[in-house]
């Protein structure tokens, strides 16, 4: 049975002890020191309370899936206040919480969230890391494993296309109203997008939907769903060039050097950075796209798939027009679209820049 699980995929355990010290207790096969540092920054073990049990993020070319579990040694009866001791493996008796981290090369939060959850249950019950390797080997060899009451994992039941559509594109349109056109424009032109939210759960739900606005590219690798403001992470972010990056640190709002548009989930506002305003002059095409997006909210029969197909069609029409605007260089014999050639056509204000950006984003200039 074919599986996307590889024996090179790492499984790592980070544990928080009774003294609030957080350490990497086990890893197979290995991770770099940089990746270890990034995971520590992103796990909620460093916080007093577990803010979100499951999160997904990206560093360099690796997707990071973190599932965090509390280890209770006793349970309080709500009715009479009596305390019942919980049987905990010896290896976990000084552990108050642990994060099981899967590092993979593909985006599929539902798949790896399920796998991490089941593995976490196995580790919490046994405290035995070798049992995690058994799970990994069974998926690699058979495409599935069953650990009874702790869960069953079947690799083939997780279609990545379902992960793409997990958040409704209509919900995102509803959230931002008319300002959604700025998000569409930024995605279409491959501009740098920063999304801010106080809550990581809200951040992850929204940011994963942004590639839906340019679904024809099917590129979820542009996402950096959760980034901290550490120098290491920001350096990696900048090196990618184009990204949709999520932050929960409000100081990111003042870092205009890192974004072309800022999507603030807390205020439900979208703002353009001062150095990028000339890239976001809206014309008749933008108004047409915006009308289509807003009209979809008024018709319950229009599905998310209908919206995505409609956007794909509008982009196809735009690209057909761009192909007709190509000019051939007499020296090289190559056809391309230049900003200069567009400006000679005396298009409406801002349209030349927009079309040139689209041409580059879609690879029309080679």
From Swiss-Prot:
Q: Outline the extent of the cDENN domain.
A: 169-309
Q: Show where the dDENN domain sits.
A: 311-366
| Phenotype reported upon loss of the gene | No visible phenotype.
Entry-linked PROSITE patterns: DENN
Sorted UniProt keywords: Endosome, Guanine-nucleotide releasing factor
Q: Where is the signal peptide?
A: none
A single GO CC term, please?
A: late endosome
The processes (GO biological process) annotated in the record are: protein transport; regulation of early endosome to late endosome transport
Instruction: Name all uDENN domain ranges.
Output: 1-147
* Single annotated GO MF: guanyl-nucleotide exchange factor activity
Q: Which residues cross the membrane?
A: none
List the disulfide bonds in this chain.
none
- What Gene3D superfamilies does this protein map onto? 3.40.50.11500
- What compartments host this protein? Late endosome
State the family it belongs to: Belongs to the DENND10 family.
Functional summary from the UniProt entry: Guanine nucleotide exchange factor (GEF) which may be involved in the regulation of homeostasis of late endocytic pathway, including endosomal positioning, maturation and secretion.
Q: What is this protein called?
A: DENN domain-containing protein 10
Species source reads: Dictyostelium discoideum
């Amino acid at each position: 049975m074919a599986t996307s699980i590889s024996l090179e995929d790492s499984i790592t355990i980070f544990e928080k002890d009774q003294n609030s010290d957080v350490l990497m207790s086990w890893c197979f096969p290995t991770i770099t020191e940089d990746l270890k540092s990034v995971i520590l920054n992103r796990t909620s073990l460093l916080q007093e309370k577990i803010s979100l049990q499951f999160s997904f993020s990206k560093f360099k070319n690796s997707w990071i899936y973190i599932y965090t579990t509390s280890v209770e040694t006793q349970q309080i009866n709500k009715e009479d206040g009596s305390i019942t001791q919980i049987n905990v493996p010896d290896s976990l008796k000084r552990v108050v919480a642990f994060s099981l981290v899967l590092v993979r090369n593909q985006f599929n939060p539902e798949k790896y969230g399920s796998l991490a959850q089941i593995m976490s249950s196995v580790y919490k019950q046994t405290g035995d890391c070798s049992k995690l390797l058994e799970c990994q080997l069974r998926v690699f060899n058979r495409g599935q494993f069953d650990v009874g009451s702790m869960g069953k994992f079947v690799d083939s039941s997780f279609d990545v296309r379902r992960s793409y559509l997990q958040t409704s594109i209509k919900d995102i349109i509803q959230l931002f109203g008319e300002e959604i056109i700025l998000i569409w424009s930024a995605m279409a032109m491959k501009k740098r997008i920063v999304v801010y939210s106080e809550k990581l759960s809200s951040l992850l739900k929204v940011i994963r939907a942004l590639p839906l606005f340019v679904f024809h590219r099917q590129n979820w690798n542009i996402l950096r769903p959760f980034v901290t403001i550490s120098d290491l992470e920001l350096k990696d972010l900048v090196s990618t060039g184009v990204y949709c990056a999520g932050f929960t640190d409000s100081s990111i709002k003042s870092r205009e050097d890192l974004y072309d548009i800022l999507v603030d989930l807390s205020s439900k506002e979208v703002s353009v950075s001062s150095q990028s305003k000339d890239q976001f002059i809206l014309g008749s095409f933008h108004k047409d796209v915006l009308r289509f997006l807003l009209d979809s909210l008024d018709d319950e029969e229009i599905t998310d798939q209908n919206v995505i197909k409609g956007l794909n069609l509008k982009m196809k029409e735009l690209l057909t027009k761009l192909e007709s605007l190509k000019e051939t260089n007499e020296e090289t014999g190559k056809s391309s679209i230049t900003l200069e050639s567009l400006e000679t056509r005396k298009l409406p204000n801002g349209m030349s820049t927009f079309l040139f950006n689209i041409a580059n984003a879609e690879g029309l200039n080679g």
